[in-house]
Amino acid sequence: MAALSLTGCVKDELFDTPHPGKGSITVTADWSARGEGIATPESWNLSMGDYHGTETAATHAPDHLFEPGCYSLVAWNPATDISVSGTSASVTSTADGCISGELGWLFTSVQDVTIEADRDHAFTAAMQQQVRQLTLTIRLTGDAAERVEGISGRLSGVAGTMDFASDTYGAPSSVALNFTKITQGENAGAWTATVRLLGITGESQQLTGGITYAGDNLPSTPIASDMTALLAGLNENNTVPLSLACDLETPTQAGVTATIIDWEVQEEVNADIK
């Protein structure tokens, strides 16, 4: 009897990617939620698990492969006077005991993602603007208005930190308001200060400061204003600058604090500043 020889066939398992046990990612940053006139940042950072990368293009495709599982994908851009650790942003302190009011434009994105083995994943990081611009304009009236040499101030209740994963604000701080005189345009003669803030926090926001005059005959005038109600919505709608203006009569006697009560929201006005 002839011997019968049987040959067995082994079928190779087929995979969809060169990394069957892990997953890859491609992340595209969406910068469309920017305020008017704000440029797309030159670079941005991405953190996911034990991976950290920096990108200058719109899309980041790292060589790094990820184990299957759930991750938090965090993206942000470097911004002047803001440091980021995890999902916490902190504002730089200044020598006068305040925090910086000259922040760069910070954008962030946080999302939970799931990585599957043997799969290439494509994600979009919708970058949200986290810094809002605030402008205060004081229109001076009264006999001493033309003698005003300078206006200085501080705004309290400003957020020194923010957790952009939970949208919570902390570290109540003050920011300096450096008013400059407008020399042309609709508000010529008024004094204005512009700051960029992460947000507000704490129970109240108070403006304090002083008006100084040319010459030695008139002492400086303290100024004060409770801004709490006016700034209650500052942490929302960051892409739209907030501009507030008021009329303030210069006091005619020494030792009187000029209290500002009636602020009004104003449209953005182009002006030349001295």
Residues covered by each model-derived region:
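Conserved "repeat-terminator" motif of extracellular CCP/Sushi domains
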Residues: H19-P20, T124-V131
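Structural motif
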Residues: V27-P41, T137-E146
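Short, surface-exposed binding/anchoring microloops in extracellular/periplasmic proteins
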Residues: Q128-S156
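Eukaryotic extended interaction platforms
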Residues: L248-K274
